[in-house]
């Protein structure tokens, strides 16, 4: 059975999708961009600031479903410029230092609202 996850602590969806969907013990978190959930404005002028906001948004959806970052088993990262890869990794590694999840990182030509990064994750309860 599918359970829809929603929290005011993450940005409202900007299209016909859910912030998260839980099926059994697996949680699928939709792509998060660096939008402040209180103002609905893009935050951060650089990849470091935007990465922090994105991961904080992901944490909010995870926590709304009773999960934590340690439960993330896979992440998909979309960067507007692959030259930001190293700087992105420096921030990402602070959140996923203990048993980091599997990950795919790709460069894309454009992201919603012209942000620098979008991340989606899959989490599973142990």
UniProtKB/Swiss-Prot annotation:
GO terms for molecular function: deaminase activity. Pfam families: Ribonuc_L-PSP. Signal peptide: none annotated. CDD domains: YjgF_YER057c_UK114_family. GO terms for cellular component: cytosol. InterPro entries: RidA, RidA_CS, RutC-like_sf, YjgF/YER057c/UK114. Belongs to the RutC family. NCBIfam families: Rid family detoxifying hydrolase. This is RutC family protein SSO3206. It comes from Saccharolobus solfataricus (strain ATCC 35092 / DSM 1617 / JCM 11322 / P2) (Sulfolobus solfataricus). The lineage of its organism: Archaea, Thermoproteota, Thermoprotei, Sulfolobales, Sulfolobaceae.
């Amino acid at each position: 059975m599918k359970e829809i996850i929603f929290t005011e602590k993450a940005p409202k969806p900007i299209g016909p999708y859910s912030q998260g969907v839980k099926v059994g013990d697996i949680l699928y978190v939709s792509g998060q961009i660096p939008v402040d959930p209180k103002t609905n404005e893009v935050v951060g002028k650089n990849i470091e600031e935007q990465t922090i906001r994105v991961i904080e948004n992901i944490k909010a959806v995870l926590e709304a479903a009773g999960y934590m970052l340690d439960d993330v088993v896979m992440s998909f990262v979309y960067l507007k410029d692959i030259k930001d890869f190293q700087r992105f990794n420096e921030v990402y590694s602070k959140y996923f230092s203990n048993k980091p999840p599997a990950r795919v990182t790709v460069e894309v030509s454009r992201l919603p609202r012209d942000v620098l990064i979008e991340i989606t994750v899959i989490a599973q309860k142990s």
